[in-house]
């Protein structure tokens, strides 16, 4: 499955929640997509369908392809801790996600573009791999020549989210990935245990 680049609201309506963040269009049309969306009832789904839907929601939320997501699950399974929680922690430690959380980009899709276009450094070195995994203590910054980019400045000026596991200095346009977030510090509405059950079948 290729990375989805179509209308975000359509996908959000499929899951019944704004999985990509604030979405005014979703708020106006909070029902399944399609010609008979308003008439459709979210009927009872099979256990497999519920588990699959949760996995798809996580993949769309973080913008991760199936192969990458499966690899993250395998890594989480081999790591000490609760597998589902570790899986989400690995997703949160991706560079594109941290760039999004820091407010450098308004969405993870935008964060991937910023990283891919070489606007971000990690510990002083340019990193253009969105899936790059950060370690506690890593410093993430906007590249010097990119600090005046309108898209970045606009995103930072509109950002109001504060997370305990990252710091951000808006004057220097740099921050630190302080620690791996605990599950309670991850705001995503994902039932990770359903994903674990699906992959363990």
Curated annotation (Swiss-Prot):
Pfam families (alphabetical): Ribosomal_S4, S4
Stored SMART domains: Ribosomal_S4 (SM01390), S4 (SM00363)
A biological process term (GO) from this entry: translation
Keyword Ribonucleoprotein: yes
GO cellular component: a single term: small ribosomal subunit
S4 RNA-binding domain mapped to chain residues: 93-153
Keywords: Ribonucleoprotein, Ribosomal protein, RNA-binding, rRNA-binding
GO MF annotations in UniProt: rRNA binding; structural constituent of ribosome
Complex formation: Part of the 30S ribosomal subunit. Contacts protein S5. The interaction surface between S4 and S5 is involved in control of translational fidelity.
Family: Belongs to the universal ribosomal protein uS4 family.
Purpose of the protein: One of the primary rRNA binding proteins, it binds directly to 16S rRNA where it nucleates assembly of the body of the 30S subunit. With S5 and S12 plays an important role in translational accuracy.
Name this protein carries in UniProt: Small ribosomal subunit protein uS4
